């Protein structure tokens, strides 16, 4: 049985998904989505403890996918952190408006990413207790 927390990494760049997976997988089970539509479906079906969401993705962008996850009864409590190369303040504000709890810009420090994943994945556990 796998007792690891699940983190969904949604990014259209395979190398980013693999990099994040390498960083997180010793402590977390990592699920992958290559576009926003896939991210919404996986979040609904797998109920991850955290979603790391890119903004610029095909099918559904990260904002729209974040909004869809946060406005669905099954997935509304899943914390979402935007993981993106778009670092403008307006993008941060829009991410918060869509329901994201954190904003991580690329390039990122692997230790910082792991720390943020630990912190934000535990948000769901704390609210579920």
Question: For the regions a protein language model found, what residue spans apply to each?
Answer:
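C-terminal output helix
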Residues: 108-117
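Short hydrophobic/Thr-rich beta-strand motif most characteristic of the beta2 strand and flanking loop
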Residues: 28-34, 42, 104
């Amino acid at each position: 049985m796998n007792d690891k927390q699940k983190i969904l990494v949604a990014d259209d760049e395979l190398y980013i998904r693999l990099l994040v997976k390498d960083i997180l997988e010793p402590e977390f089970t990592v699920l992958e989505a290559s576009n926003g539509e896939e991210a919404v479906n996986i979040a609904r079906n797998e109920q991850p403890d955290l979603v790391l969401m890119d903004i610029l993705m095909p099918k559904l962008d990260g904002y729209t996918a974040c909004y869809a996850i946060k406005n669905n009864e099954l997935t509304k409590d899943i914390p979402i952190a935007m993981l993106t190369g778009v670092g403008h303040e307006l993008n941060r504000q829009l991410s918060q408006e869509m329901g994201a709890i954190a904003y991580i810009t690329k390039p990122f420090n692997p230790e910082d990413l792991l720390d943020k994943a630990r912190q934000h994945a535990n948000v769901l556990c704390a609210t579920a207790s």
